[in-house]
Amino acid sequence: MYETEEDPTTSNVATTNNEKTASTAATTTEPVKKVTEFMRVQRLFRQVTKSANGKNIPKEKREPIDYSPVLDFHNLENNTEENKKLIIDCTSNVTTHDFEFNRDTEFYLHPREWKVYGLQGYPGFYFIKSPFTASQQKKWIKHALEDYADPPNNNNITLFHGPIKNLWKNGEKELINEELKSQGKHDDDEIEQPTRPLDKNGEPLPTYRQLLDKLAWSTLGYQYQWTPRLYSEEFYEEFPDDLQELVQKIAIATKFDPYVAEAATVNFYSEDSIMGGHLDDAEQEMEKPIISISFGSTAVFLMGAETRDIAPVPLFIRSGDIVIMGGRSRYCYHGVAKIVENSFDLGLIDENDDQDLKYKIQWLKEKNRRVNINTRQVFKVPKLGGKLINKNE
C-alpha cells in the first residue's frame, strides 16, 4: 500500500510574526524525525535535481545514481560479491510434475521454462525472471489500462470524482488528436471528439488525457478502504478470471497452493514515482503470499525486514518479472526506491502491433512508466467470488 515519506531533515519552525521583537521572540523547533536504515537506503537512489540556490539542474548535468549495490537476478555475474551470496537458485524447486498444464495459454509460459531465485535470509521469497513473451506482457498491459482501471473498480481519480468510464479509450482518442494536430492532419469532422468528463456533481473535469496522466492506482476484487485500512464485503467487485488463473498457477508452481486472489492493487508508476517502506498487513490471511507482477520500466525494489531499522536489500525488477513475498517476507517492510531512468523495455515496441496497442506502449514509454499488479488472499477461508481453478485444466 502507499505511504508518504516525510523528509526528516525538514523541521517545522514556529516564530513570532513581529519582526521588531525577533530578538526576544520564542522559537520552537519540532524534533527531527529519525532517519531509519530503510530511508537511508531509499535515498541512495534519489537524484539531486536542484542546486544550492534552488535552480533546477538539467537532466544531462545531474550526478548519476550509483546502481552498483542493486542485486540483479538477470545478470548474475554483474553482482557484487556480497549480493552474489544472497542469491539462491530455486528453479529445481518449481512444481511442474504434480499436475498437468494441459492447455497452452496466451498469458504466460509453461513453468518448466521459468527461472526462479530466492533471497538468502528470506524463506518464502521468490523472484521469477519474466515468464512472459513480449506479446503476453502486452496482453496484461492492455487489461491493466482498459479493464482494471475502469468502473466498477476504484482508482485514485474516481475515489474523489466518482466513476469515470472508458478512461483509457477516451484518453487514447485525445492522444490521437494531439498527434494528428502535431502533424497538421487534424480534422474535427473525421476524428471523434470525446465529451469532456464530468465529476459526480456534474462539474467538468480536466481532459481524459490529463486524468490518464494522473492515474496512480486501481483496486480489484475487495476494494481496499484506504482510510480505515480494511477490506469489507460491502465493497467487492468480481475478480478477473484470467488474473486469478495466472496467480493460482504461480502459487501452485511455487508450492503456495491453495491460493485464491481476492484483492489486487494495480499501481501505475511514472518516472518520478516512489513508494515508501510499508507493510501489507490489512489481510486476515497472512500465510498466503503477495504475488507481484510488473511491466514496462525497471524499478529498484527494496526488500526490508520486520523493522525499518534494518537496511533493506535493493534489487532490480524488470518488465515481466514476478516477485512472490511469502514466509518471512510477507511480514517485512518493502517499497520502491526508484524507477530507473530510460529503462523502458524496448522489446515491447513492435511496428506490427495494432494501433491501439502502439498507443498504450507509447503512453508508457513517454514517461518511463511501470505497471505493477499485486494480488493477495484476504480471508483464511475465501469468501465472495473466491474460487480455485482445476489443477488439471
UniProtKB/Swiss-Prot annotation:
The keyword DNA repair applies. Substrate binds at residues 217, 224-226, 308. Its cofactor is Fe(2+). 2-oxoglutarate binds at residues 267-269, 370-376. The keyword Metal-binding applies. Its EC number is 1.14.11.-. Pfam families: 2OG-FeII_Oxy_2. One of its GO terms (biological process) is oxidative RNA demethylation. Keywords: Dioxygenase, DNA damage, DNA repair, Iron, Metal-binding, Oxidoreductase. Induction: Up-regulated by phagocytic stimuli. GO terms for cellular component: cytoplasm; nucleus. Transmembrane segments: none annotated. Putative dioxygenase that may repair alkylated DNA or RNA by oxidative demethylation. Requires molecular oxygen, alpha-ketoglutarate and iron. This is Alpha-ketoglutarate-dependent dioxygenase alkB. The gene is alkB.
